[in-house]
Amino acid sequence: MARRYMIDSILYWAQEYHIDGFRFDLMGLYDVETINAVRAALDTLPGGRDILMYGEPWQGGGSQLHRYEANKANLAMLNDRIGIFCDDTRDTIKGGCFNAREPGYVEGRPGSFWDIGGAVAAWCRSDRLPPHAPSQIVSYVSAHDNFTLWDKLLLVRYEKPEFTAADGTALAQNRLAAGIYLTSFGLPFLQAGEEFARTKKGKGNSYRSSPALNRLDWERAEKYHALVDYYRGLLALRARFPRLSSTDPHAPDALYFFSLEQPLVGWQLPAQWGDGAAWQALCVFYNPTETSKAVPLPVGRWQMLSDGISSSLWRGPARVYEHEAVLMPYSATIFGQI
């Protein structure tokens, strides 16, 4: 009866209120059969296959199911159009959420560059999960739970951070974090306000905090308007290279990773023929260090689309590179083959 109640309710909301996406809190408390049945029921509706469905692949504690929970461990049993919040991607990029001081790749954690490749491929080329398709992976670094991205970046570097103060390094690391997950396969997700360095003044869980702490501070949107523009440019750039949003389980196989000095990460991805991509291929580099780095470019002519500060260079006069380019500190640098 509980399963029937869930399915009937969700179908009603989708049909009567035209809700086009469902997020399941603590999805691991439900069983695989129920969650798959919800997906199957939605798919019977006109346009139902376009309705998003994803959730938290954990229980938040114990479970009476003991097996077949709709969690990360049973990802292979879930429909390939049921997504999960990927904490592997989150923690690889910015560091663990339960230890405020634990760094991730963007803060210089040693050895973390190995997992960045897994995150870029939505873990489709890894034995860690693995998903049926990249569309099962929700790539993100911050949500309503735990520290905001801005707070986490400051907590890693300072014993007593000034959360409302400007910080150039944190700003650059914020851009790098966004530059990684917004150029990765999967379904990108960001917390409201991440694009203007949202802070909750170091509160890890603010569900019991005041509205003043939880509100969106629109003055920060003005203060950090360049960061807002950076996110806007990355989202527009991503939309012009559809292969990054492919649901094909084999799409990440086309990624070619370069051999670079550690901890730099670089990769090339050709466009899918006929998908209307603006460039023949993407070439992307991540530099989590505090110094500039020179890197070789693949054969061809490469237009710089983003230098790690401006993500809208592709809208202006073409800056074309061949043979070599220099990466700025704490940057995600993106090139398009022309």
What does each model-found stretch correspond to?
Residues 1-63:
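Active-site neighborhood of glycoside hydrolase catalytic domains
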